[in-house]
Amino acid sequence: MYTRFWIIVALMMFSLSAIAAETQIMVRAKAVDSKFIGTSVGGIRAIVEDAETGEILDQGWINGGTGDTAVLMENPLKRGEPQTDEKTAGFLANVDIDAPRLLRFKLIGPYGYQQAYQEASVTSWVVPGKDILGDGIIITMTGFIVDAWTRVLEGGQVDIYTKASLLCGCPITKDGLWQADNYEVKAIIMRDDKNIDEVTLDFTGPIGMFSGKTTITEPGHYKAVVYLYDAKTGNVGVDRSMFEIPKAL
């Protein structure tokens, strides 16, 4: 009887120790050379899963503001200083785990601009009851938002336009924090998957607008692959626009 009693006590203690503890993790998305990604570009889908089994433990949306421009872009942060505040975009994940687990934090978006979709992920150990709050886990997402379109005029003139921004929606302007002269913007003209021309798109302002033109006389269907490239960071954004050169009547 005495032995049985202590076996029961041990089992109860083991059961208590195995009870899952709810743990909170703040997850955020940050654009390259820019600010946080959130509501202004349609939000970012966040998925928290076990890195070994793929079990999804929580998922939701990163929404909120892009953060304080002065803190993020103008004044160098000192060690330990927060990058975020209560308005900065983030997703507060809640996971129930009963032992330390290696989790994967996966981001997909921005959902307001399908052509700019990116996916990024990072893994981190999480210990039951040990929250990861404040700035939380910040994941950098590459890319720009590039929205391109074309217009075909008489004589085979093709006008190419694009409106571009940082992935967080931050503006590209002539004299602002993200200056148009720092980016290469071009359109690669393709037909049947072959490059036939390359057109430089010049900044026309006031915010994020670029345009260029070319002339194509051969009737057929074409594709303009428009890209914006930052040589300093290696960051790239792309969009595509189809157009047709009609046969002469």
Language-model features: locations:
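Sec/Tat signal peptide C-region and signal peptidase I cleavage site
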Residues: 14-20
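Short amphipathic, basic-aromatic surface patches that mediate peripheral association
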Residues: 28-38, 163-178
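Short coil-to-beta strand junction motifs in C2/discoidin
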Residues: 38-45, 175-185
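Surface-exposed loop/edge segments in extracytoplasmic proteins
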Residues: 52-60, 191-200, 235-236
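Aromatic sugar-binding surface patches on proteins
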Residues: 67-91, 204-211
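Surface-exposed, short loops/turns at beta-strand junctions within beta-sandwich domains
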Residues: 96-99, 215-220
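Short acidic/polar inter-strand loop motif in beta-rich domains
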Residues: 97-118, 229-238
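Short, compositionally biased P/S/T/A/G/V-rich stretches that sit at domain boundaries
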Residues: 125-170, 248-249
